[in-house]
Amino acid sequence: LLVLMDTDGNVIRGTCKPSSEMKMHLRVYKENPAIKAVVHAHPPAATSYAIAGLPLNRAILTESVMGIGEIPLAPYAMPGTEEVPDSVAPFVKTHNGCLLANHGALAWAGDAMTAWMRMESIEYYALVSMYTHGLIGQVQELTCDQVDRLIERRTRDGITTGGRPQCRDCGQEGTEACTSCGKNANGDA
């Protein structure tokens, strides 16, 4: 079922017809030449967040903040069209993966093992989020200072992408400054 292709979409090896989703994979490679592997899957917990229209952007797990960062939600796109790669493109240089609205998840990295582990991490993050928010109903999120320290560690460990989760104190995301720490979701003051 695997088809080996070049970055122009030409089949090098394999007898199956490539999926229309190959456009999404190829776009990730073109957007960020450092990416050498892309994993697309439909893991149940992460896909549930994608169907609900919710990104994975809360600072609840130290491992998630350090390892994959926030996982944004790419807007809905019609399968098989250029809308799909266009919806993913804005996240490729700044994040390590994304959810695909009403579809599934996508992870990328400099090698296949790391891309696969990031997909596993996305699903774990989604599953823990479901348990704590839905079943337990109580979440103790990390503070802005704790998130900053984890991001500094992540950067020292060589991971320069991942975004910044929402601030616990005010839930601020996007370009507006947090009323607690003064930073936006990109970590800019």
Q: What are the functions of these language-model segments?
A:
Residues 1-189:
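Glycine-rich flexible loops
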